[in-house]
């Protein structure tokens, strides 16, 4: 019980220390990533598969990389669990909203109102196996990404310049995204949608490439945010709390 109280206190201090905009973007990206994953992307080859979740999934990893570099992998993982819990709460809200009798604005197509309305309810309400798969996949990828990022930082010769930040971010994001995509594909797409193992692996690899490229594009702004945090001593309360609790 004392351990639980300690963890709750630690997380509460952490949430006060992480800039609110960063945490907000992180949580919003996790929620929208899972919602957009309902739409697949048409690709020219049958063995390739991607969904629209890749539009924002890179933002989740960018936030995790910045938090990991400044606060450490445990803090980034705790923030990830908070994002997951908020996402589960929003999924419950979406599910309840989908069960409320009514008509969606986009369903007003003569002769197809009921079909379109039902499809929109199904998309917003979601299904248990997609939610389960996406939750497990994100938790696994967050842990892999955060601790890989931290480990790469420890072996880097110069851990304060952009080159070092970019190296650890690109590699950890690539590995984390591959784990995310593959875990989701194996749990959901392979079991429920009939994807072959080849499609699962290719989807994971293709998504990893696309999302890592997004990380490359936006990594420099992430690095500048990190420098601003360091300059303004962001997270002082958290660091002092962790130092005191370690004694």
Regions found by a protein language model. Name each.
Residues 2-84, 88-89:
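Hydrophobic transmembrane alpha-helices
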Residues 40-41, 45, 71, 75, ...:
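Membrane-interfacial segments
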Residues 76-82, 162-169:
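Membrane-interface alpha-helices at helix entry/exit sites of multi-pass transporters
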Residues 87-108, 138-146:
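Transmembrane alpha-helix/helix-exit interface in multi-pass inner-membrane proteins
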Residues 97-127:
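Membrane-interface interhelical connector segments
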Residues 118-137, 141, 154-160, 168, ...:
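Membrane-embedded alpha-helical bundles of multi-pass transporters/translocases
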Residues 173, 181-191:
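A structural feature that tracks compact, well-ordered secondary-structure segments
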């Amino acid at each position: 019980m004392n351990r639980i109280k300690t963890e709750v206190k630690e997380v509460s201090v952490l949430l006060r220390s992480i800039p609110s905009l960063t945490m907000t973007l992180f949580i919003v990206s996790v929620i929208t990533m899972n919602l957009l994953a309902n739409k697949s992307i048409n690709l020219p080859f049958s063995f390739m598969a991607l969904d629209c979740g890749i539009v924002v999934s890179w933002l989740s990893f960018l936030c995790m990389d910045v938090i990991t570099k400044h606060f450490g992998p445990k803090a980034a993982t705790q923030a990830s669990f908070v994002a997951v819990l908020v996402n589960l709460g929003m999924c419950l809200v979406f599910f309840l909203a989908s069960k409320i009798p009514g008509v969606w604005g986009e369903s007003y197509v003569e002769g197809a109102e009921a079909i379109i309305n039902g499809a929109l309810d199904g998309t917003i309400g979601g299904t248990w196996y997609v939610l389960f798969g996406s939750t497990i996949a994100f938790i696994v990828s967050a842990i892999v990404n955060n601790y890989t990022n931290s480990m790469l930082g420890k072996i880097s010769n110069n851990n304060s310049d952009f080159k070092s930040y970019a190296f650890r971010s690109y590699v950890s994001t690539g590995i984390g995204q591959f784990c995310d995509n593959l875990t989701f594909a194996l749990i959901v797409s392979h079991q429920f949608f009939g994807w072959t193992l080849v499609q699962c692996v290719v989807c994971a690899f293709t998504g990893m490439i696309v999302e890592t490229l997004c990380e490359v594009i936006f990594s420099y702004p992430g690095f500048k945010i990190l420098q601003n945090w360091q300059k303004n001593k962001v997270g002082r309360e958290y660091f002092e709390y962790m130092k005191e609790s370690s004694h």
